[in-house]
Each structure stands twice: as structure tokens, then as C-alpha cells.
Curated annotation (Swiss-Prot):
UniProt keyword Repeat, yes or no: no
Site label Important for catalytic activity, positions: 162, 320, 333
Record Pfam families: CBAH, NAAA-beta
Protein's name according to its UniProt entry: Acid ceramidase
Lineage of the organism: Eukaryota, Metazoa, Chordata, Craniata, Vertebrata
Assembly and binders: Heterodimer; disulfide-linked. The heterodimer is composed of the disulfide-linked alpha and beta chains produced by autocatalytic cleavage of the precursor.
Main function: Lysosomal ceramidase that hydrolyzes sphingolipid ceramides into sphingosine and free fatty acids at acidic pH. Ceramides, sphingosine, and its phosphorylated form sphingosine-1-phosphate are bioactive lipids that mediate cellular signaling pathways regulating several biological processes including cell proliferation, apoptosis and differentiation. Has a higher catalytic efficiency towards C12-ceramides versus other ceramides. Also catalyzes the reverse reaction allowing the synthesis of ceramides from fatty acids and sphingosine.
GO molecular function: fatty acid amide hydrolase activity; N-acylsphingosine amidohydrolase activity
Residues with glycosylation annotation: 195, 259, 286, 342
Keywords: Disulfide bond, Glycoprotein, Hydrolase, Lipid metabolism, Lysosome, Secreted, Signal, Sphingolipid metabolism, Zymogen
Location(s) in or outside the cell: Lysosome; Secreted
Active site: 143 (nucleophile)
Signal sequence range: 1-20
GO cellular component, as recorded: extracellular space; lysosome; membrane; nucleus
Length: 395
């Protein structure tokens, strides 16, 4: 066990490092240019595509994918168990997860419970641990999302998904354990019905909700976590205690991608539906002005911030802080993102220049798993695994 003097030194060193980390080079940098098509040290590689056949029974939909990804899923589930056991070494928490969690969190809506049971069966991972893997994303998703509109009224949507803060640090290669273990699980999915694409999404194999996706020709949506005292833990506790009138945020994204038929319908659902965890829904459409950030607490919408190109608002940027508040000074990705977009100018916005913005530190950081670029109108959806070689901020 660390002595108090050593522990204090480590904590103080970390605080001092963080105080300066996001304010000076090499932790920040000038806006990147010419990073697209992706290459070089910040590009880990492409993300594979798989098809999910929604005509199959829910229990069987994920079998083909999970046969391939079961080994990688077992690695990350074991890491999650190790993190839990580090706090409660007796192993009692994991025993409760395996034995009690399915009963406590039973009656998931729609097809999700059967899908998770099917994943548990094919991977031979206990159902409780599959459920734990699925609810993790109610709490730890830290992201940057952008929607832009060019001079012709054409919309683009980009996002970095950052995940894994405080979930294990590998001192041998200076990376977050969970972040690195999610990269082999990252997949692009083509959800089909009657052999036709219904929607496309990027997710982690084993997770049946969605955080990033689009319905070709109609709308795109990404989810960012919103920090709040009345947060996801409270929502989960209410669910366990029997109050199940709210939706899991990853499941509501999956639901609108599967069932909604327009930008306005999706906007209405994401604005009014009760949810288990506070969130930001970043929604893009297919016409001028159809782009917004919906700031949510668990019961209602607090703000809808929309594109307004006629008055010069040709982009919206959302990280993990309310737009009317200053971001936490140790985690300001909003300011550099807006600065780089302003330097780019509306005339030059494209997949390439959005990728440049999302490749600029600290928008790109040690937590970044992947970058997605979406063009709803053209039906383009590109996902790239990322790296942030040292020197690089931890978040």
C-alpha cells in the first residue's frame, strides 16, 4: 500500500501536471492540417463492417459478430472485474453482478434483453457481466461532437468518442486500459431489414445500445455524457427499485435510429422522453438549419441550441459541459474546437477539415477511441480508430 507521503506526492504531481497540461505545448498545438485521408501516428486503422439482420429473432442477431469478437470482449470484461475487485477485493461485487444483476435490472425494453441473453450465450460470459458492460456507457462517455453547414446548406456531422477515464492506467505505455481494449471491439454496423439498410452505426461489439449513428438521407445522432449530481447512478438506482418510466440513453438512440422517420420526429423524442442519465443529444438532419444540441437532464430538456446560418451560426460544438457555462479548466476541448472551426471558415468545411479539427490536441487525447465523419445527404459514414502518441494529454 502506498504511504501517505508518497500518495500525497503522486496526487499533487498529477494536479500540477493537469493545471498546465491543457494550456501550453506540447499538450496543445496549432490547428492540424492535411491529416485526411487518415495516416501517420494518430491513425490506428480502419473499423470493420458487419451486418445485423433485424429480421432474425433478437436472441440470434448478434451471434455471427460475437463469435468473432468474443475473445476481445472477454478481455475487457475481465479488466472491468479487476477494477471493481481493486475497490472490493473480496469479489463480492462481481458475485452480485453475476447472480443478482439480471434480476435487479430485468425487463429491459424492446429486444434488448433477449439480445443481451444471446450475446451471453455465444460468448459464454455471464449475463450479469454482459449487462454491466452495457450500462457502463451511462456513466463514462466523454466526447466531442460537431455539426457544420457549408455555404450551400450542406450538413456534416463529426465526433470523437472518448472513453475510459480513471478506468485503469497502463504505466508501461501511458495509455488508459479500457480505452485501448475498446479499440479491437469497435465495429461499424449495417442494420438491415428485408435485406435493405435501415441505419448504420459505430458501436462496441457486445453493446446493444448505440452512441453514434445515422439514417441515410434522414438524420444523424451522437450522444455525449452530461455530468450532473442527479446523474446516471440515480437513474439506475430508481430502475432497480422498480421505477422504470425512463429510457436508457444508449437504447433511446438505438430506438430512434430504428424507428424514427425524420429529423423533427427524432428531435421531439429526444427532447421529451424521460431518460436514466443526463445527456447531450447532437442531432443533424438533411436540410439547412437542421442541426442542434439538446441538453437534457433526466426528466426534461434544458436547452436546444440550433444551427442558425442566416445569423452566422454555421456550426455547433458540444463536449461534456453546458454551453452557457465555462468548461472545467482541466478539460477544455470546446475552445480549441471552435477556434479551429473558425480558422477553417465555412467556405472550406469538409470531411477533411473536420477530421483536422478532431485530430488537434486536446480534442484528440489519450481517451479517444475513434473518430466518425457523417454526411447524411450523401449517405457517407466513415470511422477511424485513433491514437494520441506522447506528448498527449490524458483527457
Amino acid at each position: 500500500m502506498l504511504g501517505w507521503s508518497r500518495l500525497t506526492f503522486i496526487l499533487l504531481s498529477g494536479i500540477v501536471t493537469c493545471l498546465v497540461a491543457q494550456q501550453v505545448p506540447p499538450w496543445t498545438e496549432d490547428c492540424r492540417k492535411s491529416t485526411y485521408p487518415p495516416s501517420g501516428p494518430t491513425y490506428r486503422g480502419p473499423v470493420p463492417w458487419y451486418t445485423i439482420n433485424l429480421d432474425l429473432p433478437p436472441y440470434k442477431r448478434w451471434h455471427e459478430l460475437m463469435v468473432v469478437k468474443a475473445p476481445a470482449l472477454k478481455v475487457i470484461v475481465n479488466s472491468m472485474k479487476n477494477i471493481v475487485n481493486a475497490f472490493v477485493p473480496s469479489g463480492k461485487i462481481i458475485h452480485l453482478v453475476d447472480q443478482k444483476l439480471p434480476g435487479l435490472l430485468g425487463n429491459f425494453p424492446g429486444p434488448f434483453e433477449e439480445e443481451m441473453k444471446g450475446i451471453a450465450a455465444v460468448t459464454e460470459i455471464p449475463l450479469g457481466e454482459i449487462i454491466l458492460f452495457n450500462i457502463f456507457y451511462e456513466f463514462f462517455t466523454i466526447c466531442t461532437s460537431i455539426i457544420t453547414e457549408d455555404k450551400e446548406g450542406h450538413l456534416l456531422h463529426g465526433r470523437n468518442l472518448d472513453f475510459g477515464v480513471f478506468l485503469g492506467w497502463n504505466i508501461n505505455n501511458d495509455t488508459w486500459v479500457i480505452t485501448e481494449e475498446l479499440k479491437p471491439l469497435t465495429v461499424n454496423l449495417d442494420f438491415q431489414r428485408n435485406n435493405k439498410t435501415l441505419f448504420k452505426a459505430t458501436t462496441f461489439a457486445g453493446y446493444v445500445g448505440m452512441l453514434t449513428g445515422f439514417k441515410p438521407g434522414l438524420f444523424s445522432v451522437t450522444l455525449n455524457e452530461r455530468f450532473s449530481i442527479d446523474g446516471g447512478f440515480m437513474g439506475v438506482m430508481e430502475w432497480i427499485l422498480g421505477k422504470k418510466d425512463a429510457q436508457w440513453v444508449g437504447f433511446i438512440i438505438r430506438s430512434v435510429l430504428e424507428n424514427s422517420t425524420s429529423y423533427e420526429e427524432t428531435k421531439n423524442i429526444l427532447t421529451k422522453t424521460k431518460i436514466l442519465a443526463p445527456a447531450y443529444f447532437i442531432l443533424g438532419g438533411n436540410q439547412s438549419g437542421e442541426g442542434c444540441v439538446i441538453t437534457r437532464d433526466r426528466k426534461q430538456s434544458l436547452d436546444i441550441y440550433e444551427l442558425d446560418p442566416k445569423h452566422g451560426r454555421w456550426y455547433v460544438v458540444q463536449t461534456n459541459y453546458d454551453r452557457w457555462k465555462n468548461p472545467f479548466f482541466l478539460d477544455d476541448r470546446r475552445t480549441p474546437a471552435k477556434m479551429c472551426l473558425n480558422q477553417t471558415t465555412q467556405e472550406n468545411i469538409s470531411f477533411a477539415t473536420i477530421y483536422d479539427v478532431l485530430s488537434t490536441k486536446p480534442i484528440l487525447n489519450k481517451l479517444t477511441v475513434y473518430t466518425v465523419l457523417i454526411d447524411v445527404t450523401k449517405g457517407q459514414f466513415e470511422t477511424y480508430l485513433r491514437d494520441c502518441p506522447d506528448p498527449c494529454i490524458g483527457w
